[in-house]
């Protein structure tokens, strides 16, 4: 479990990439946020991290973050940050976090009386024991990591396309920009 924190009141950073629960719920798209708008401490994260929400283990919020190497990357303290010694086993850790046995273990060890108030202590998650040989973890990671990296690339592209749509659509709807009449639009395809 990562313990390096970011204090927005003491930071010289102006803008950070913020991995928050609302950002996760918005198609796992971290946001660039002005530090002066951040009210509480965050976790500093890097390429070796996997995030999962400590709230309500039944609601799976597991994130393999797309790190911005040009900015400081921070995660909400509502996430448990699992940091591996290197990013080669992140896909293994990510998939363990999705595993029903791990989720059941977390549910059995939460604090709080109702589903909306249940929390997982980071030490509980870190102390999860799994009897598996290092060679199996290595082989699994060699096979799965390329797919996980592709998933991160596609998620990043989705974010860019969503941003483009959100910029262009209001301008199209208001008439500020128009599609020229000489462009043929195919009704049965998603292309112009």
Where do the language-model regions lie?
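Amphipathic alpha-helical coiled-coil/heptad-repeat segments
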Residues: 87-88, 104, 111, 127-192
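A short beta-sheet element
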Residues: 43, 47, 51-103, 108-124
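Sequence-specific dsDNA recognition surfaces
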Residues: 1-50, 59, 64-66, 74
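Short, small-residue-rich loop/turn micro-motifs
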Residues: 20-25, 55-56, 134, 183
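Short, well-ordered beta-strand micro-motif
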Residues: 20, 81-83, 129
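A generic secondary-structure signal for well-formed alpha-helical elements
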Residues: 4-8, 55, 59, 100-101, ...
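Glycine-rich, flexible loop/turn motifs
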Residues: 15, 20, 31-34, 70, ...
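Alpha-helix capping/hinge segments and adjacent helical runs
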Residues: 2-6, 85, 191-192
């Amino acid at each position: 479990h990562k313990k390096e924190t970011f204090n927005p009141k003491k930071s010289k950073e102006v803008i950070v990439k913020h991995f928050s629960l609302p950002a996760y719920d918005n198609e796992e798209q971290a946001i660039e946020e002005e530090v002066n708008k951040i009210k509480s401490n965050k976790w500093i994260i890097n390429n070796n991290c996997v995030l999962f929400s400590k709230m309500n283990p039944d609601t799976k919020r597991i994130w393999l973050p797309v790190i911005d190497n040009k900015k400081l990357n921070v995660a909400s303290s509502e996430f448990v940050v699992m940091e591996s010694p290197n990013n080669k086993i992140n896909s293994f850790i990510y998939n363990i976090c999705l595993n029903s046995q791990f989720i059941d273990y977390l549910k059995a060890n939460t604090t709080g009386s109702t589903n909306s108030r249940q929390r997982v202590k980071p030490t509980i998650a870190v102390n999860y024991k799994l009897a598996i040989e290092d060679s199996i973890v290595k082989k699994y990671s060699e096979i799965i990591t390329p797919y996980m990296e592709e998933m991160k690339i596609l998620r990043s592209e989705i974010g860019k396309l969503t941003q483009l749509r959100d910029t262009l659509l209001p301008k199209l709807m208001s008439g500020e920009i128009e599609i020229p009449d000489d462009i043929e639009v195919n009704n049965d395809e998603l292309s112009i």
